[in-house]
Amino acid sequence: MMERITARKNPLLQQVRKLVSSRKERENSGLFVADGTKLLTEAVKWWPGLETVLLSDGVEADVPEHVRVVTVPKDVMESISPMQTPQGALFLCRLPE
């Protein structure tokens, strides 16, 4: 089941912003952020630590049922993505041990 987030101050979106901007936050939480539909496809195939996927409106992805999937408006995706031109798929993964 997909969730929908529209508020920029949502705790998940605030966490994503911190992970993007702070190495210390990534180390403390054990998570990292990646961006891109092709990279997401590879993460689904090969990365067991895939936890949460954020998708822009209109972007679809085939992810396992145990992975949290959240849709957001395009402007919200642009506000949290580390990329200048986001591809519409942002995801959180566990750092390797």
Indicate where each model-derived feature is located:
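Arg/Lys-rich RNA-binding interfaces used to dock onto structured RNA substrates
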Residues: M1-E97
